[in-house]
Amino acid sequence: MRSPKNTTQMVGLNVVYDDDDMPRKQEQGQRLLERMTQYAAAADIHMQTQVRVAANIANGIRHAYKEFRATEILIGMHMHPEVSQKFWGEFHQSLFNGLNSQIIMARLTQPLATIRRIQVAVPSRAQFEPGFYRWLERLCRLGSNLECHTEFFGREDVLPLIENYVLSRHHDMRVSYTRMAHWAELPSLAASISADNLFVVVTARKGTVSYKNALEFLPDEITRHFSGSNIMIIFPDQHGDAMDEMTFAQPQHTEEHSAYEAIGKWIKKKL
């Protein structure tokens, strides 16, 4: 998802609660970050790591984000109901409501390298978001690097813009475009998603140009129709499209703050 010309380092972040279990969680977090560093090194990417202690996980991530002058966040979605019954987990809503930068949330049930198809649901008016081309560039690079077919679903006003961008920047990419007249058609896409597919949903924050009330039902729709699928959810950047840096933030604990539901663990062997 990252440009090979980009030499800016990644940051691997693990935030743990400041409680009696902190020493053990710090040790676990450090071991996880060491594995992440090895994966990054195998791809010739330098990664700086930090285990951070915080009373509030979302605030801990936000403070680290500012300190490292990061440009976006990639964070895991949990798959463990014993951790949290909520789709968004306990702190993620506070995170994406508190940061206007691009946030990518992912839940992978298999190594990323084994993905054979990417399907992307794009909401109406997505082209008017400042970060439209940022997430599009990320997905184009992902599809090209995995050498898998990418299919974009969206309305007739946004698909030509995506097609023009792909033709001009990633003309060798295997790609197709399918009209999705209304967001209510989202559940119907589940029938075409296989176990080795990645389903990507481009969503929106409340108050932004592409936000719609139907997005409030996204957690229920994903839980009901895409529960076993590899999922990626993208909150577009609200500042622009400087397409270069990415930060990795790995959640380890949850806290109360939610209106959606699932997210917490990813990245161990997914890169």
Predicted regions mapped to residue ranges:
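Cytosol-/stroma-facing membrane-proximal "stalk/adaptor" domains immediately downstream
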Residues: 25-29, 33-106, 113
